[in-house]
Amino acid sequence: KLDDVGNPIRANSEKSHRLGLEVDASISLSKQFIVRPNFTLSSNKNIDLELDSEDHETKDIAYSPSVIFGNILIYSPLDNLHVSWLQKFVGKQFMNNIELSAAKLPDYFVTDLNIAYEIKPKSVFDSITITGLANNILDRKYVSNGYMWDVYPYYYPQAGINFLAGLTLKF
């Protein structure tokens, strides 16, 4: 459908369903090692979707991967020092509701490294935490988002390896 000046009208799906399972855990392997796995399995469907007077039957809902999993491995060699290895996998997804092949975002896997050191001074602050984060340490090239303009895909590629530093002051 078009509006009064010829632009496509965006509309909600009339019938859809989302069904999924999310699981996360925190497992202490020892005083120094903790593992925190998580995963999501889901089915996200538009049912009997009709667009531009065409019936597209049952298709995946846009931007809804059916598989996501992650893991955090935390190593604490000292009570106030934590080194975390973070991994995340996101399954394929589509940028539109009709599963157009040009609208497919491929799955991706990224790995980050986080180091946090906490100081507990005796005055002014309850604690000071210094944090360093290296994102995408394997320097993977991936796309996590984008949009479609008609049948043409436009992507938002993500940064390669990048670094962040932080300082948290607690009173």
Model region roles, listed by residue range:
Residues 2-10, 42, 48-60, 100-105, ...:
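Flexible, surface-exposed loop regions and adjacent strand-edge segments
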Residues 11-97:
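Gram-negative outer-membrane beta-barrel transporters
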Residues 34-36, 103-115, 134-136:
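Conserved long hydrophobic alpha-helices within structured protein cores
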Residues 45-50, 115-121:
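Short regulatory "switch" loops immediately downstream of catalytic or recognition motifs
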Residues 92-94, 117-171:
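C-terminal beta-signal and adjacent terminal beta-strands/loops
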